[in-house]
């Protein structure tokens, strides 16, 4: 598995939307009681093949979400989409979270749960079958889904790596 080449994507040129995946409240015990903080994991995307995620931490929920959105815009990747789905099946593990993604025929819909669904919706994938195995921690599940989308390559990428034309790729 080879990561797709990281071409510079300028998030300012994209019409990015954001989706909040998870908010977590943390507590620090101090002399006077408990001091609460928040962290938010946010997925950003243009629903046309660009997606990213960000983690924001702050003392207020809105500040954490805003920081997460800014972080997500810095981590945008390009996803190859073929006829509303992914070109091939992939299984990816991040930490203890394992995500399996399979291409589906048009009309199947987006069959995914929770955090993976948010990532795929923001990427603009309409027909896909997914299964989240192992840990259900939203942080690791989102990272596994993004990692999987990074490793997906279409026929053009395969042809470039092998220095072959598109017809040669399909013959072999």
From Swiss-Prot:
Q: Name one GO cellular component term.
A: small ribosomal subunit
Q: Does the keyword Isomerase apply?
A: no
Q: Which PROSITE patterns match?
A: RIBOSOMAL_S5, S5_DSRBD
Q: Which GO terms describe its molecular function?
A: rRNA binding; structural constituent of ribosome
Domain notes from UniProt? The N-terminal domain interacts with the head of the 30S subunit; the C-terminal domain interacts with the body and contacts protein S4. The interaction surface between S4 and S5 is involved in control of translational fidelity.
The GO annotation for biological process reads: translation
Name it. Small ribosomal subunit protein uS5
Q: Which Gene3D superfamilies does this entry report, sorted A to Z?
A: 3.30.160.20, 3.30.230.10
Pfam families, A to Z:
Ribosomal_S5, Ribosomal_S5_C
Task: Return the similarity comment.
Answer: Belongs to the universal ribosomal protein uS5 family.
The positions making up the signal sequence are none
Alphabetically sorted, this entry's keywords are:
Ribonucleoprotein, Ribosomal protein, RNA-binding, rRNA-binding
Oligomeric and partner information: Part of the 30S ribosomal subunit. Contacts proteins S4 and S8.
Q: What does this protein do?
A: With S4 and S12 plays an important role in translational accuracy. Located at the back of the 30S subunit body where it stabilizes the conformation of the head with respect to the body.
**PANTHER family named in the record:** MITOCHONDRIAL RIBOSOMAL PROTEIN S5
Q: Which InterPro entries match?
A: Ribosomal_Su5_D2-typ_SF, Ribosomal_uS5, Ribosomal_uS5_bac-type, Ribosomal_uS5_C, Ribosomal_uS5_N, Ribosomal_uS5_N_CS, Ribsml_uS5_D2-typ_fold_subgr
The gene coding this protein: rpsE
Q: Which domain of life is it from?
A: Bacteria
Domain S5 DRBM intervals: 16-79
């Amino acid at each position: 598995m080879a990561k797709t080449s990281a071409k510079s994507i300028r998030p300012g040129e994209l019409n990015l939307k954001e989706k909040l995946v998870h908010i977590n409240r943390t507590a620090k015990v101090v002399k006077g009681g408990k001091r609460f903080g928040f962290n938010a994991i946010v997925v950003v995307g243009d629903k046309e093949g660009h997606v990213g995620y960000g983690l924001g931490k702050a003392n207020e929920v809105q500040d954490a979400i805003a920081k997460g959105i800014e972080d997500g815009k810095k981590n945008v990747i390009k996803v190859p989409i073929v006829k509303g789905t992914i070109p091939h099946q992939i299984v990816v593990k991040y930490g203890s979270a394992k995500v399996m993604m399979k291409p589906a025929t048009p009309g199947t819909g987006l069959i995914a749960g929770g955090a993976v669904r948010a990532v795929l919706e923001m990427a603009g994938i309409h027909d896909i079958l997914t299964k989240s195995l192992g840990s259900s921690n939203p942080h690791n599940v989102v990272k596994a889904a993004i990692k999987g989308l990074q490793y997906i390559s279409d026929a053009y990428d395969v042809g470039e790596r092998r220095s072959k034309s598109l017809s040669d790729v399909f013959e072999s």
